[in-house]
Amino acid sequence: MANDLASELEADSIFMDEHSAGANANHLRALSWAAEQSDRVIIIEEDALPVDGFRDEAQDWLTRFPDNLCSFYLGTGRPPQYQMQIAERLIVADKTRADYITLSRLIHGVCYSVPPEHVHRVL
């Protein structure tokens, strides 16, 4: 599954949880690797379902928001404690014709990108 996704997205690197350390440990490995890269990195879990043209779409968003942590996934059921806030932000975005919402924190680790200058803060 992970290898198929990596191939589909032409990923530069892949981090597999071969020792059952868990998602958090694997995100830490990926973020540590990202901290050593000169280019911005997108971290995506193997169960993500990227849209067609994801690489180009993601690049457009990262160009648009170079200094922001960008999440490319918004769940409609999890985490439950954020659903009301998400709904409120979506209503505001709809009224203002915005094509994005902002939150004060990352609430999903499915697919995200941290600006290179902030990766060490996340670690």
Q: Where are the language model's segments positioned?
A:
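An acidic/histidine-cluster motif and surrounding catalytic segment
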Residues: 1-44, 48-123
